[in-house]
Amino acid sequence: NDNLLVVNQLLTNWGLTKSLSLDAGASYNMVKGYEPDRRINNITKAENGYTLLRGNSQQRYFSALDEDDINVKAGLVYRLKDDVEEISNIRLGYTGRFVDDSFKATEYNLTVEHASDFPSLDGFLLDDYYNRDNLSSGWFKIQKNVDKYTVTKNIHSAYAEATYQFTSRWIVNLGLKYDYVDINVDYNVNRGGSEGSNTIRKDYFLPSLNLKYNLNEKHSLRLGASKTY
């Protein structure tokens, strides 16, 4: 296989004031996956040596996967005074993810109709059998099948959360996240048996609650509850 993964990231943090900071970032990820020529050939024992297995047993396969993935984020952090460890803060921000996927697989099934025996595997070349003359003479048949799909995914998220340390033992975190999900899939697979398009456009509101109680310097108890999809 011929595969390629490229990851590019840029992250920054700006201190706007003593209490207010901005976290921002962006990334572009690219995936390329190619299977240029996978071959499957089945040979069986015969009376005079070997022969190509009859039926739809020989195959050539090509596939290509391309994915572009863009991620962005920006968030404000406002630090609160809690007179304990000063870890209390309020966060507001946005994240976005935009993905384009495409996949195409081409499969050639070669059905052997006539095949002569060959005494040894040494020096045997399949190109001597799979050629235009033998195809025209009906020694084998070719069936072509193409499976493909494309996916477009856009997710916009806005969030707000607050963390406050009431005492040296108690820390509370409350949050609310809003996701707008827009996904579209176009597909034609299973030899045309499954063809169509599906779309998801939905809003999600996702609250969360986290409690932490410090028993001592080394041990603590945590309780978390959240909604996901």
Predicted regions and their residues:
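Active-site donor-binding segments of glycosyltransferases and PAPS-dependent sulfotransferases
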Residues: 39
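Structural signature of Gram-negative outer-membrane beta-barrels, strongest in the C-terminal barrel
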Residues: 2-19, 26-28, 63-73, 79-134, ...
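Catalytic phosphate/nucleotide-handling subdomain of diverse soluble enzymes
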Residues: 45-47
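Outer-membrane beta-barrel pore domains
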Residues: 51-63
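Alpha-helical solenoid repeat scaffolds used for protein-protein interaction
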Residues: 19-22, 34
